[in-house]
């Protein structure tokens, strides 16, 4: 599940820190996760800075960059990085055990094209990522906040869509996925109304899961139980 920060804005479109779109459940690190934090963070961890990072300097090369918001335990993100060594990947996660698990997984997989933030995703996007610098932004299985009174906590709102658009290159893609049909309808409504995007679905709604997005264990179990998953892909134009 993706867990990210606030979804409330002031009149100028600036994010406010009032409504969180995640529940902070820190949890204790396992021995392996703690070891990965100690050994791997200096190699692929990114410390938050309030100014844009230089992607060429960070990765030591020029390449298209994919950013994932809320990577959970990181298994699918590491799998994607390993499967596409020609791309740069950045993952953002607020929960430390997930970061530790991702670092351990990355070390085991031997990936060198992945960097990780343990920080608030909105702050990273607003301040650390240059405009027009990303080839793709991924938001997979964000908290659906399924109760109506909690819908304001959903991360996918109009100002958030604009923030993502500003960070994408022209032709870059915002890829969303959810296993809550109501949230997929909300996502579609927000993204269809958002200026500067084109839906990549030929039917104007959802797309089939692309081959590059790994099928998670949770998702595979859902399929066996007859649960749906909805992917949406919107291109910056």
From Swiss-Prot:
Substrate binds at residues 147, 179, 216-219. It comes from the Bacteria. Pathway: tRNA modification; N(7)-methylguanine-tRNA biosynthesis. The active site is at residue 143. GO terms for cellular component: tRNA methyltransferase complex. It catalyses: guanosine(46) in tRNA + S-adenosyl-L-methionine = N(7)-methylguanosine(46) in tRNA + S-adenosyl-L-homocysteine. Transmembrane segments: none annotated. CDD domains: AdoMet_MTases. Disulfide bonds: none annotated. Its EC number is 2.1.1.33. InterPro entries: SAM-dependent_MTases_sf, tRNA_(Gua-N-7)_MeTrfase_Trmb, tRNA_methyltr_TrmB_bact. Keywords: Methyltransferase, S-adenosyl-L-methionine, Transferase, tRNA processing. Catalyzes the formation of N(7)-methylguanine at position 46 (m7G46) in tRNA. Belongs to the class I-like SAM-binding methyltransferase superfamily. TrmB family. NCBIfam families: tRNA (guanosine(46)-N7)-methyltransferase TrmB. This is tRNA (guanine-N(7)-)-methyltransferase. It comes from Shewanella pealeana (strain ATCC 700345 / ANG-SQ1). The lineage of its organism: Bacteria, Pseudomonadati, Pseudomonadota, Gammaproteobacteria, Alteromonadales.
């Amino acid at each position: 599940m993706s867990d990210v920060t606030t979804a409330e804005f002031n009149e100028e479109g600036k994010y406010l820190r009032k409504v969180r779109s995640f529940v902070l459940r820190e949890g204790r690190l396992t021995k392996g996760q703690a070891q990965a934090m100690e050994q791997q963070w200096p190699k692929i961890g990114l410390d938050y800075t309030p100014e844009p990072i230089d992607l060429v300097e960070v990765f030591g090369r020029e390449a298209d960059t994919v950013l994932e918001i809320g990577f959970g335990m990181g298994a699918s993100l590491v799998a994607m990085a390993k499967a596409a060594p020609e791309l740069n990947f950045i993952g953002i996660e607020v929960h430390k055990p997930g970061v530790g698990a991702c670092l351990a997984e990355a070390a085991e997989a031997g990936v060198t094209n992945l960097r990780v933030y343990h920080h608030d995703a909105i702050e990273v996007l607003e301040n650390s990522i240059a405009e027009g610098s990303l080839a793709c932004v991924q938001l997979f299985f964000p908290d659906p906040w399924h109760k109506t009174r909690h819908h304001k906590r959903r991360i996918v709102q109009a100002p958030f869509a604009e923030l993502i658009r500003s960070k994408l290159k022209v032709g870059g893609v915002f890829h969303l996925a959810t296993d809550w049909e109501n949230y997929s309808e909300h996502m579609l409504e927000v993204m269809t109304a958002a200026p500067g995007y084109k839906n990549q679905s030929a039917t104007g709604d959802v797309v089939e899961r692309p081959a590059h997005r790994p099928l998670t264990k949770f998702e595979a179990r859902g399929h066996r139980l007859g649960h749906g998953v909805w992917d949406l892909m919107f291109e910056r134009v």
